[in-house]
Amino acid sequence: ENEFTPMVGAFGGTMIDVSGSSSVRINAMDMEKGYADDGKNPLADKSEFIMSLFEQIMGDDVNARHRSIIDRCIKDLYSSYIAGGYHGKSPTLTDLYNMLRQQDEDEARELALSAELFITGSLGIFSQETNVKQDNRLTSYNILDLGEQLMPLGMLVILESVYNRVLQNWRAGKRTWVFVDEFSIFFRYPFATSYFLRMWKRLRKRNAYMTGITQNVGEMLRSKDARWLFANSEF
């Protein structure tokens, strides 16, 4: 509800207002070095994340052929970026969209058309290079005006953006605190729930500490995932 804007401003922080009508752009395909757990292939995790975005858009229509095409394109798009030591510009969803349209399979064109609204269309705020600074010691993401169409997708991308920032700090030897107000909202969206729980487990390995704040404990206790989270947390 935008309550933190005065406090963030008073402390010289950065407030990032994320909505379909704002000029803010956050690249859903940003990927920092150390993205995967030790010894794991970062492309496997990134491919899974991008598949989650398409599953959020297309629902149960995403099948094994769609997933194979996404995985193939992700490997191609990131190959030079990773080979270059994660320097330069990350690929974008626009790059992925263009590559999908170049594939031979009908399913690739289905993926491109289904995601068009969120890539080249009017809701494409996560399909371009990130244009906001996220390196302030105090950074707040405001999703008040995100809207129902963008909310499920936006939650995934913002969590991904926060995770990338945690990785930057971890590699620089810095500790990160992540506070999520009204975090019961995340448990209304299955894919956001899954990602949120994964972050809850992984951040401690990256010298980061995550705090969830909610007044709706009763609502959350109806969720099996939320009950697991409470059982593995301090109060």
Where would I find each of the regions flagged by the language model?
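Glycine-rich phosphate-binding P-loop
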Residues: 1
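C-terminal regions of RecA-like/P-loop NTPase motor modules
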Residues: 220-235
